[in-house]
């Protein structure tokens, strides 16, 4: 009897070894966040970059959550941010004091100036983070900010916005946080 079906067609190849994501040390995160402030607190772009990176590290948010964040998603009095995640899932995450201070400084000094730069007839009033032209910041801009700030901080390992998310989770777990709780953040 001849075999007419390829019995090996249903067999799946074993998965290759997955690599662990790049994670910054606590010292590298500190250097990154310090480097974001280089250029002075009066420059609205510097103020925005510092607030953006503090926000991303403090919340462990995805880039899309940072770019999609609106002013009314932030409660600085309660130290809480409302994030809209994948699948339109909303979650509340705590905002640390460093992030709250950086966001407050940005809102008090930088954001208004960036909003005034808009050439649009109706300025962007909702977005938390604005680009140099007063519009909602893009994913690409966030990537460029993270990369440029990492270079200024002397960080040589691969660095991208998601690295902050991985670092956030890793540092929480290293600090004793429950893995299930971190997964929900």
Which residue stretches match the model-derived regions?
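Conserved catalytic core of the tyrosine transesterase superfamily
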Residues: 1-185
């Amino acid at each position: 009897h001849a075999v007419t079906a390829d019995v090996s067609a249903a067999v799946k190849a074993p998965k290759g070894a997955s690599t662990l994501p790049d994670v910054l040390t606590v010292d590298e995160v500190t250097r990154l966040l310090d480097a974001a402030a280089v250029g002075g607190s009066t420059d609205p772009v510097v103020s925005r970059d510092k607030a953006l990176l503090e926000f991303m590290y403090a919340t462990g948010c995805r880039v899309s959550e940072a770019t999609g964040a609106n002013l009314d998603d932030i409660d600085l009095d309660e130290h809480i941010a409302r994030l809209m995640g994948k699948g339109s899932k909303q979650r509340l995450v705590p905002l640390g004091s460093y992030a709250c201070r950086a966001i407050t400084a940005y809102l008090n000094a930088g954001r208004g100036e960036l909003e005034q730069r808009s050439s649009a007839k109706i300025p962007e009033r909702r977005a938390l983070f604005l680009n140099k032209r007063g519009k909602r910041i893009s994913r690409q801009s966030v990537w460029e900010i993270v990369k440029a700030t990492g270079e200024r901080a002397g960080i040589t390992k691969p660095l991208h916005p998601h690295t902050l998310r991985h670092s956030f989770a890793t540092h929480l777990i290293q600090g004793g946080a429950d893995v299930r709780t971190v997964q929900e953040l």
